[in-house]
A protein has these predicted regions:
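Bacterial N-terminal signal peptides
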Residues: 11-20
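Venus flytrap/periplasmic-binding-protein-like
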Residues: 79, 127-129, 134-138, 215, ...
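Periplasmic-binding protein-like
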Residues: 93-108, 126-130, 178-183, 209, ...
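Extracellular/periplasmic Venus flytrap/periplasmic-binding protein
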Residues: 85, 135-136, 144-254, 291-299
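Beta-alpha junction/loop-to-helix N-cap segments that form part of ligand/metal-binding clefts
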Residues: 30-32, 45-55, 59, 64-140, ...
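Bacterial N-terminal signal peptides that target proteins for export
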Residues: 2-12
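Segments of small-molecule ligand-sensing domains
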Residues: 310-323, 334-408, 412
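Extracellular/periplasmic periplasmic-binding protein-like sensory domains
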Residues: 250-330, 410-413, 424, 436-438
Length: 443
C-alpha cells in the first residue's frame, strides 16, 4: 500500500511538473497587452468601440499565426476613465500575464497617461497615446517611452486653423475672424489652450475659450455666450456626452452646424446620432475614415466577427470611427512588435525592446498596402526626435446618415509647433533632472 501511494505521488508530481512546463512553454511564446479599458460611464462609447477594435485586430493576428509565431494575449481592467482607477490598473497589469511580458500600455485617456507617464518610463514600458496625450512627448529625446502616435493635440488644432483658413480663402483671411473654442474641462480639453492663443496671435484672429465642465451635460450658458459673440467658427473639443449636447445646444441658439468643427474626439457616429437633425452638416477632423471597405477590416470580419468572436456588444458598430481607430492602434502596436522582433529575435520581447520598434516605425504606402490598411492608416515615420510621425488630418461632414470626406490631407504647421514642443520638453527635462538623449547617436 505504501509503495502504491509513493508511485501515485510520484506520478502526480510528474504530471504537475509537466503541466507547469507546458504552461511555461506556452507563456514563453506569448506577448501580453495590458488593457486599461473603459466600457461603463459617460465615455463608454469611445472606450468600448476603441478597445473592441483593438482586441479584434489582436484576434485577427492570432488567427493568422501571431507575430512570427508569437501569439498575442491580453486582459482588461476597467478604469471608467477615472485617473485613480487607471493607475491601479496600470500597477496591476504591468508585470505581464502568466509569464508573457507586457509590450505596451494604451490607456486612451489623457489623465491616465499623465498619471502613469513617469511610472511607465521607470518600468521601461511604452505608453501609447494615439491622437492624444501630452504634446511635448513628441520629443522622444526627453520622453523615450511615450508615443503620441499620428496626431498630437497641437497638430490637431493647428490643422483645424489651417482648414478654416482654406475655407475663408487663404491664411491671410483669418485676420479679424472670430473663433470660439468649446473645450472639455479636463487635462485633455485644456491641453491646447496655450497653443491656440499663439496661433491666434500669429494669424490675427479673435479667440474665445469656453470651458464645459465634465462630463458636459450642461452647456446652456456657453451657447448663450456664443450667440452673443457671433463667432465665424466654433471648434468643438469635446468628449463623450458633451458632443451631442453641444450640437443640440447650437441648434437651440441658432448656430449653424456646418460652422462647427469637431476635433479628434468629436468625430464619431456616437457623437452625432444622438443629436439627430441637429448634427446634419457638422464637420469634424479624422485621421482615419469609417467604413469596412479595407482588406484588413474584411479579414477581421471573416476570421473574427463572422466566427462569433467579435468583441463588440453591438455588431452594427463594426467599421465605425471608434472601432476603426482601435484597429489602427492595433496595427501600430503589432507593427512595432514585428519590427522589434527583426532586431531582437522572433520571441516575446520586453517593453524596452518593443520601444525600439515604435521609435523606428516606418509605414509607407507599400507596407500599408501589404497590411490591407492603405487609406485607413496615414503613412507614418517615427524617430528619436519625432514620436508623432504624422500630423495630418482630413475633414469629414455628417449628412444625417454617414460621414463623408470633404478634404484632402491637411497638414499641421509643424515648423511653427516644433520650437514650442522642444521648449516645453526642455522645461520638463530641467524640472525632472533628465538628460535628453542625443538623437544623432540613436540607431
Amino acid at each position: 500500500m505504501t509503495h502504491r501511494l509513493s508511485l501515485r505521488r510520484l506520478a502526480l508530481c510528474l504530471a504537475l511538473i509537466t503541466a507547469g512546463l507546458t504552461a511555461g512553454a506556452q507563456a514563453a511564446n506569448e506577448q501580453y497587452f495590458p488593457l486599461q479599458s473603459y466600457r461603463v460611464g459617460p465615455y463608454a462609447a469611445g472606450g468600448s468601440g476603441f478597445f473592441g477594435g483593438f482586441i479584434d485586430y489582436l484576434q485577427y493576428i492570432n488567427a493568422n499565426g501571431g507575430v512570427n509565431g508569437v501569439k498575442l494575449t491580453w486582459s482588461e481592467c476597467e478604469t471608467e476613465y477615472v485617473v485613480e482607477k487607471g493607475v491601479e490598473c496600470y500597477e496591476r497589469l504591468k508585470g505581464g500575464l502568466n509569464g508573457a511580458p507586457a509590450a505596451a500600455t494604451n490607456p486612451l485617456s489623457v489623465g491616465i497617461a499623465y498619471a502613469t507617464l513617469e511610472r511607465s518610463t521607470a518600468d521601461k514600458l511604452p505608453l501609447i497615446t494615439i491622437n492624444h496625450g501630452r504634446t511635448d512627448s513628441t520629443d522622444g529625446s526627453v520622453f523615450p517611452y511615450v508615443f503620441p502616435l499620428q496626431l498630437n493635440p497641437y497638430s490637431e488644432v493647428s490643422a483645424i486653423i489651417n482648414y478654416i483658413g482654406q475655407r475663408e480663402g487663404g491664411a491671410d483671411k483669418l485676420k479679424g475672424k472670430k473663433i470660439a473654442v468649446l473645450y472639455h474641462g479636463s487635462p485633455y480639453g485644456k491641453e491646447t489652450n496655450g497653443v491656440l492663443q499663439t496661433l491666434a496671435k500669429n494669424a490675427g484672429f479673435e479667440l474665445t475659450l469656453l470651458e464645459v465642465p465634465h462630463p458636459g451635460n450642461e452647456q446652456q450658458s456657453q451657447w448663450l455666450n456664443i450667440r452673443r459673440l457671433k463667432p465665424d467658427w466654433v471648434i468643438l473639443r469635446g468628449w463623450g456626452v458633451m458632443n451631442p449636447v453641444a450640437l443640440k445646444s447650437a441648434q437651440k441658439v441658432g448656430y449653424p452646424a456646418d460652422h462647427i468643427i469637431g476635433n479628434i474626439w468629436s468625430n464619431s457616429e456616437e457623437d452625432v446620432v444622438p443629436a439627430g437633425a441637429a448634427a446634419k452638416g457638422f464637420i469634424s477632423i479624422t485621421t482615419h475614415p469609417s467604413g469596412t471597405d479595407f482588406p484588413v477590416l474584411q479579414g477581421i470580419a471573416q476570421s473574427v466577427v463572422n466566427a462569433g468572436k467579435g468583441n463588440l456588444a453591438d455588431p452594427k458598430r463594426f467599421g465605425t470611427v471608434y472601432y476603426n481607430l482601435g484597429v489602427v492602434n492595433g496595427i501600430l502596436n503589432v507593427e512595432a512588435l514585428r519590427l522589434a522582433q527583426e532586431k531582437y529575435g522572433q520571441k516575446p520581447l520586453t517593453g524596452e525592446q518593443v520601444r525600439w520598434g515604435f521609435e523606428h516605425l516606418n509605414l509607407d504606402d507599400a507596407r500599408l498596402q501589404a497590411l490591407g490598411a492603405k487609406g485607413l492608416v496615414q503613412p507614418l515615420k517615427l524617430s528619436c526626435a519625432d514620436h508623432e510621425g504624422g500630423g495630418a488630418v482630413r475633414f469629414q461632414q455628417w449628412d444625417g446618415q454617414r460621414w463623408n470626406l470633404i478634404s484632402d490631407w491637411v497638414q499641421a504647421d509643424r515648423a511653427l509647433l516644433r520650437p514650442i514642443i522642444e521648449a516645453s520638453a526642455a522645461g520638463y527635462a530641467k524640472e525632472k533632472g533628465i538628460t535628453p538623449r542625443d538623437c544623432s547617436q540613436e540607431q
